[in-house]
């Protein structure tokens, strides 16, 4: 990489001192540990219906839902799939499963039937909680004992019941479960640094540690309090929102306003109505905020913090947002699902804030270690030298579900998780991301694994070979594009290929451009040489962007 690696490891730690982490507690006990301080304060607010539950009501309802899930046969170590938008029912189901020592695997409700079936089967889900409009996509699923819907449906199959039946269960039926800190509580799916989606095993200890790294201590890195109102517009099936919004909010005793989906005008109405103070966003939402003229018609002065994550945010976009929200502290965090997910957080969000640089994604979280290595040699690099970012700490995943080989490729023998991201740490301990080793495409913060799309493409009889890479896009970040080798005599068109894929995948995985090519460039090992394809793409498309 143009730098001389050092055999002596340079390890970076937070500027803030390490803290005590009550990692003996199950996640649900940890989140409600300070319940007595804010039991009567609002906890969950449905941004669509305005229904509000206090902290005491959420704890009680979670116990009832847990008892209801137990009555349906959910046991310790079992998996429930939450195929839901942001909703009170999502939160109650997640906590209810945790109380039973069960795991929640979260899935995007916009997934196609095939995508849902793959994840449910791989995770070994026993029960699915969803909306009635998605029940038709669940037909033929093996191993599912019951489907629970959160809305009133006119007609549902026999094995479908309403969520209200869970809520009406006597909480006394909830069994006492001995939950071990190393037990898995969350099972999100991620493509990791490469390849197909895999179940990421996040334990009670791991998530307790991750939340504590952010919001606990005398000078928390992420200063939330019971006086704060958090806007939960990012989907809870994504680990960023589940961890840094929901779990951190619960731990701090803040009110959490749940938005089922992103609509810019409704978002501003909720900010004004509930005096939202904390706004966790992703760059595409920031783009809407700065471009939409309606923003100026609403009072958004209550926002004191804008957190951005899931994808990098450019300096120009940052500056435009500062003009719209002059009262807000703006900063970025950095993470990946396998890391628990938060690796670093902007110290401008601390109770006693630090000055931070534009473009930085913060400093490494407390009670963790970070190093930068030369990807070729594995040797540690010092400050201001770009290399692969590695993280170590109790917050990282236990491993990939039923995939020890992929786990070994991601977490080394010394416990370092290799992110596949290229970055450097400057003289002030701030982390900057400069490139990606991993092949994932980031569409508005969502992961798109090229290998998943390639596997679909090459099953088509008119395609001999295929490769998928990304192209930059101003509003979406990155878009998937395909390079295709036609089968002999085939005249398959770009439009036919796009339609073939769009029928099988969720909207953000759709192919946006198709380029026909004589052969896919590959190394002797058979690995696709994506750099060559990106170079060709740069020649085809001015500025490397969508035409």
Curated annotation (Swiss-Prot):
Disulfide-bonded cysteines: none
Record keyword Ligase present: yes
Catalytic reaction annotation: (E)-4-coumarate + ATP + CoA = (E)-4-coumaroyl-CoA + AMP + diphosphate
Annotated binding of ATP, by residue: 190-194, 238, 310-312, 332-333, 337, 421, 436, 527
This protein's UniProt keywords: ATP-binding, Ligase, Nucleotide-binding, Phenylpropanoid metabolism
Known pathway: Phytoalexin biosynthesis; 3,4',5-trihydroxystilbene biosynthesis; 3,4',5-trihydroxystilbene from trans-4-coumarate: step 1/2
Keyword ATP-binding (UniProt): yes
Function: Produces CoA thioesters of a variety of hydroxy- and methoxy-substituted cinnamic acids, which are used to synthesize several phenylpropanoid-derived compounds, including anthocyanins, flavonoids, isoflavonoids, coumarins, lignin, suberin and wall-bound phenolics.
Domain remark from Swiss-Prot or TrEMBL: Both substrate-binding domains (SBD1 and SBD2) are involved in the substrate recognition, and are sufficient to confer the substrate specificity.
PANTHER family named among the record's database cross-references: AMP-BINDING DOMAIN-CONTAINING PROTEIN-RELATED (PTHR24096:SF149), LONG-CHAIN-FATTY-ACID--COA LIGASE (PTHR24096)
Name of the protein: 4-coumarate-CoA ligase 1
Origin species: Narcissus pseudonarcissus
Gene name for this UniProt entry: 4CL1
